[in-house]
């Protein structure tokens, strides 16, 4: 007889039994005489530095870790030392998008687009009036593609600071606003609120990208950062028209729902405006394939590798609290210097994940 220890059930004030997922404990598939897995303590968070503000996003490029902390673009070395490069403005509480070309690092902050050039050590804003508001962006085939929620805009191939208004494109299969842009296998995914459209570079004198009609996904995303690349697909929180929010992975016109009924119930506890601020991140480490869903009072984590090994959806919860649930205080994961670098969403602290302690920033947390 096998003992189920990777999750449990409990009674609530509804007629249904609810699923109880591990809190700050990570399910690990491992067959034994009594169970098909075990729980190990969640990763600890160790601080090693501070920056000029709360971290808003990070990226590793050409051997250097870049972060936007407060309104400042900074670099972080292996010891946690922070060097300020320039100012990209606020709001300091909003996440940024970072992506790079061969020679420029792009930063979308507060509706603006900036470029850091490490060769000249200069930070400059794209001030072309035809660029418009930059809600999100990605780099693809030599272009920086941005969206203001309505149009798809590309910079000139020979000048990333120039925009030609006759080269605007749009995501028009459904009259829903564009929420985010992601690149997957050199195709651009325009994630709208009810649909996801895929574009490929076909060249031409006007907008150089063309919609791949057969690749459209009939579901959308709830917010700009509620999506990420995961397992060579796109993971997102959202749904189609007249659908409650859930968590999916999708690509090439197909989706797979990975959220369970319990996870869906937890999502329904948040308002639409709260869900619009959800952040998704992925992290592959030691035979685990994690998808983090950062919510206001904790983070839900899906493990695709464990789910495949156990034949059921494996979820667990992370929280930086001794009692109850509170915001999980590790965000914006960056693999660099042989460790996972993280930041604290509630302070200017930066650090890294460890497995020899379960403390978060020196404080004890619950199980």
Q: Which ranges hold each PLM region?
A:
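Asp-box/WD-like beta-propeller blade repeats and closely related beta-sheet repeat scaffolds
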Residues: 118-142, 165-168
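Beta-sheet repeat architectures centered on beta-propellers
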Residues: 1-104, 218-234, 239-367
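Carboxylate-rich, polar loop motifs that coordinate divalent cations or form catalytic acidic clusters
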Residues: 58, 105-107, 111, 136-153, ...
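Short, flexible helix-coil linker/hinge segments at the edges of structured domains or between repeats
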Residues: 152-175, 205-212
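Surface-exposed extracellular loop regions of Gram-negative outer-membrane beta-barrel proteins
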Residues: 189-214
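Phosphate-interacting basic helix/loop segments used at nucleotide- and nucleic-acid interfaces
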Residues: 173-184, 275-278, 283-284
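Short loop/turn segments that connect beta-strands within beta-propeller blades
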Residues: 77-80, 117-121, 158-160, 201-204, ...
């Amino acid at each position: 007889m096998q003992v189920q220890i990777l999750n449990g059930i409990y009674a609530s004030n509804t007629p249904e039994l609810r699923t109880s997922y591990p809190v700050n404990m990570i399910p690990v598939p491992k067959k034994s005489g009594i169970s098909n897995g075990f729980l190990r303590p969640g990763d600890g968070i160790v601080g090693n530095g501070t920056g000029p503000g709360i971290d808003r996003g990070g990226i590793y490029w050409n051997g250097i870790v870049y972060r936007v902390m407060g309104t400042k673009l900074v670099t972080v070395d292996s010891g946690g030392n922070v060097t300020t490069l320039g100012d990209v403005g606020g709001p300091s509480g909003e996440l940024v998008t970072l992506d790079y070309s061969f020679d420029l690092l792009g930063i979308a902050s507060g509706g603006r687009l900036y470029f850091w050039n490490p060769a000249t050590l200069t930070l400059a804003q794209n001030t072309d009036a035809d660029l418009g508001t930059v809600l999100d962006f990605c780099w693809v085939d030599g272009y920086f593609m941005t969206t203001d929620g309505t149009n798809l805009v590309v910079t000139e191939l020979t000048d990333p600071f120039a925009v030609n208004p006759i080269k605007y494109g749009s995501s028009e299969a459904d009259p829903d606003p564009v929420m985010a842009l992601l690149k997957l296998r050199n195709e651009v995914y325009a994630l709208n609120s009810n649909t996801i459209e895929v574009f490929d570079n076909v060249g031409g004198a006007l907008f150089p990208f063309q919609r791949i009609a057969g690749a459209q996904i009939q579901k959308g995303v709830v917010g700009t950062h509620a999506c990420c690349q995961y397992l060579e697909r796109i993971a997102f929180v959202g749904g189609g028209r007249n659908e409650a929010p859930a968590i999916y992975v999708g690509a090439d016109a197909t989706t797979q729902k990975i959220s369970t009924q319990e996870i869906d119930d937890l999502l329904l506890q948040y308002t639409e405006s709260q869900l619009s601020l959800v952040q998704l991140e992925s992290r592959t480490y030691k035979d685990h394939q994690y998808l983090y869903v950062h919510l206001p009072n904790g983070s839900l984590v899906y493990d695709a590798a464990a789910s495949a090994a156990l034949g059921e959806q494996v979820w667990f919860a992370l929280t930086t609290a001794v009692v109850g649930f509170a915001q999980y205080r590790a965000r914006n994961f960056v693999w660099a210097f042989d460790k996972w670098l993280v930041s604290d969403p509630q302070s200017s602290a930066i650090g890294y994940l460890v497995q020899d302690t379960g403390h978060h920033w020196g404080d004890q947390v619950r199980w």
